[in-house]
Amino acid sequence: MKFFCAFIFTALIFISLEKIGQSCCPNPIVDSEQLTIFQAVILGMVQGVTECIPVSSTAHLKIIPVALGWGDPGVAFTAVIQLGSIVSIVWYFWNDLTKITFGAYKSIITSDYQSPDLKMLVSIGLGTIPIVFFGLLIKVFIPDFDNSRLRSTVAIAIASIIMALLLVIAERIGSRKRNFEKLDIRDGIVIGLAQVLALIPGVSRSGSTITGGLFIGLERSTAARFSFLLGLPAITLAGLVELKTLLDEGFGSVGLVATLTGVFSAIIFSYIAISWLMRYLQTQDTWIFIWYRLAFGILILIGIISGVIENT
């Protein structure tokens, strides 16, 4: 029954988006004049909300513009507006970040290498290495990865479904007894390895890391909290690399004003999404995201089979 409701809800979203897109902005994104402020605000909202909950921002930023009839805004724009989410993560977790940073610095000065703050900083650092390493491998050995089959619509749908099933298993077998203070360096490495899965569009960075956290017995809110902290270096690096690309090559089919608008929109909606998720996971499970991911993936596959959605 829950899956049926999620399926119907997702279908209604797709239908509504298509109608809104056709009525408000009928032209696809093909040149610098056609990515309007309205479109940038919507795409920033999509980025902000879906980056911070375990449903994959990359998938939604590819699928939703297509459903709206706008076309794919491109990988560079998608990565750059993620910087808006970074601002919100820093804003929301400012106390955690300052405590960890200054605590780690004090520990190094006093040679207290068993300090929880130093261990947390090392955990985040070591946990970031896997996704950077594999990301560089992809850049070297699959230079056209952004246009590969792994970024196709059908691949995104399948990844969404598979990740939902992994989250089901994590919910079933995870003990959920360990809080934030019980995190150690090994946890950072394990969750960092789980984060590598996010290189596959449709998996979701927060989805893979929260799932990894649940597998090793973390509380849901603890898994989400560490997921956001761990994501800061990786998302920032990806956003800055693509920002440099846009600055070097020009903003082309996006435009500077639209990009800045998208970033600002992402800041606002990311903060709202983070605040909601952290409160939600204090008392609730992740089944709402499981049902949504299943419905999202299946609906995309149905759309492809029926010809409503193009497998690009």
Swiss-Prot record:
It comes from the Bacteria. Signal peptide: none annotated. This is Undecaprenyl-diphosphatase. Keywords: Antibiotic resistance, Cell inner membrane, Cell membrane, Cell shape, Cell wall biogenesis/degradation, Hydrolase, Membrane, Peptidoglycan synthesis, Transmembrane, Transmembrane helix. It catalyses: di-trans,octa-cis-undecaprenyl diphosphate + H2O = di-trans,octa-cis-undecaprenyl phosphate + phosphate + H(+). Bacitracin is thought to be involved in the inhibition of peptidoglycan synthesis by sequestering undecaprenyl diphosphate, thereby reducing the pool of lipid carrier available. It is a multi-pass membrane protein. It comes from Trichodesmium erythraeum (strain IMS101). Belongs to the UppP family. It is an enzyme of class 3 (hydrolase). Disulfide bonds: none annotated. It holds the Pfam family BacA. Its main location: membrane. It is found in: Cell inner membrane. InterPro entries: UppP. One of its GO terms (cellular component) is plasma membrane. Its EC number is 3.6.1.27. The lineage of its organism: Bacteria, Bacillati, Cyanobacteriota, Cyanophyceae, Oscillatoriophycideae. Catalyzes the dephosphorylation of undecaprenyl diphosphate (UPP). Confers resistance to bacitracin. One of its GO terms (biological process) is response to antibiotic. The chain crosses the membrane at residues 74-94, 122-142, 154-174, 183-203, 226-246, 254-274, 288-308. GO terms for molecular function: undecaprenyl-diphosphatase activity. The gene is uppP.
